[in-house]
């Protein structure tokens, strides 16, 4: 029960923080810089705008993937070990999925352009990346005791 509470609090917290930051940019916030711009972009695809050609079906594919991941984590008992990173992952994923349904694309706002143009991203993306790194580190460097 404690693991589920941690998971839920982290997921809800990430979702709320993500949506509040995105609201700032949807309301016109902009900050230009020499290496990083904080400006509104809508990503119709996934990372690096891949799969944008799927169009309106992408949100349904992502909803199924999120549901599948959630089912797998809960049914296999992984939540006990990975409650916090799973919360990061699901909270970020739901934040971006919400954008697809409400704004027809993910609201991105951090644009790196120092020396080269990097993908534009958001807080939810960072939460997802942190979750994946955290889980990989735990799996490979701190495997569960048999």
Curated annotation (Swiss-Prot):
The active site is at residues 108, 125. Its EC number is 3.4.23.36. It comes from the Bacteria. It is a multi-pass membrane protein. Its main location: membrane. One of its GO terms (cellular component) is plasma membrane. GO terms for molecular function: aspartic-type endopeptidase activity. Pfam families: Peptidase_A8. It catalyses: Release of signal peptides from bacterial membrane prolipoproteins. Hydrolyzes -Xaa-Yaa-Zaa-|-(S,diacylglyceryl)Cys-, in which Xaa is hydrophobic (preferably Leu), and Yaa (Ala or Ser) and Zaa (Gly or Ala) have small, neutral side chains. Keywords: Aspartyl protease, Cell inner membrane, Cell membrane, Hydrolase, Membrane, Protease, Transmembrane, Transmembrane helix. It is found in: Cell inner membrane. Pathway: Protein modification; lipoprotein biosynthesis (signal peptide cleavage). The keyword Nucleotide-binding does not apply. The chain crosses the membrane at residues 6-26, 50-70, 82-104, 123-143. This protein specifically catalyzes the removal of signal peptides from prolipoproteins. Belongs to the peptidase A8 family. This is Lipoprotein signal peptidase. It comes from Sulfurovum sp. (strain NBC37-1).
């Amino acid at each position: 029960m404690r693991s589920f509470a941690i998971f839920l609090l982290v997921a809800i917290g990430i979702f709320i923080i993500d949506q509040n930051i995105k609201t700032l940019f949807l309301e016109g916030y902009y900050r230009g810089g020499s290496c990083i711009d904080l400006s509104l972009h809508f990503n119709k695809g996934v990372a690096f705008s891949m799969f944008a050609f799927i169009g309106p079906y992408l949100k349904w594919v992502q909803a199924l993937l999120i549901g599948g991941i959630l089912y797998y984590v809960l049914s296999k008992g992984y939540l006990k070990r990975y409650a916090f990173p799973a919360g990061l992952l699901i909270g970020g994923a739901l934040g971006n999925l919400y954008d697809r349904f409400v704004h027809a694309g993910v609201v991105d706002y951090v644009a790196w352009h120092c020396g080269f143009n990097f993908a534009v991203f958001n807080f939810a993306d960072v939460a997802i990346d942190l979750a994946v790194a955290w889980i990989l580190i735990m799996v490979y460097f701190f495997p569960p005791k048999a």
